[in-house]
Amino acid sequence: VEHIYTIEEVEGVSNFSELYEMGTPVDEEEIQKRRQSIKQDDVATIIYTSGTTARPKGVMLTHRNFVSNFKSVTRILEKEDVDTALSFLPLCHVYERMLSYTYQYNGLTVYYAESIDKLGDNLREVKPGIFCAVPRVLEKTYDKILNKGRNQPLLVKIIFYWALRLGEQFDHHKKLSWWYKFKLWLANMLVFKKWRQGLGNNIQIIVSGGATLQSNLARTFWAGGIRVFEGYGATETSPVI
């Protein structure tokens, strides 16, 4: 480490704004020269493993590793009209790092959450079309929704749980009957619409990884118009397999 820059202004310490000033006189020739000197198999970053099964170790990941990964993931985004993303998982982990590169590659505007405690507020504020999470975050979100449903008047509660049961039957791999589609449309109008509003009313995709997601939870989100894509991998594979 040669230099440390603070975000906020601190007397006697270099500030982040100085980096902007350093980049003002752009030398296009120098930029192209540096770009051309980078090879696909050069190390782009070193990311440490989580240490779940063994002592954490630094993994050398190349430019080729990341590019092959986010180009594959891009096929999902190409099918959707998504232009904003919310990031809140640690960027020192390969999961969020790779998805951040994916957002940038596809020209998305990336917002960074203030904290996990303010995640709900930030979702409603920036209205992202996509975010990635671990199952525990989705489970806590689902639990909050359930708690609100439990505290509703009797008739509303009956409709709420009817919509949940309907959602748990959803299967996007199968053709849905017209009767189920009609009930699902009704459930969306009465229940799921409010869920989406609580998540910013623009969310289309949630990427889940790091652990197994409960199938009934994923089905319910899909039924509510929010597609949940699950992936698995390892730091060494940068990370999606």
Map each language-model feature to its residues.
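Conserved pre-ATP/AMP-binding loop-to-beta segment of ANL
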Residues: 6, 24-48, 55, 78-84
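Conserved AMP-binding/adenylation subdomain of ANL enzymes
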Residues: 67-84, 91-192, 202, 227
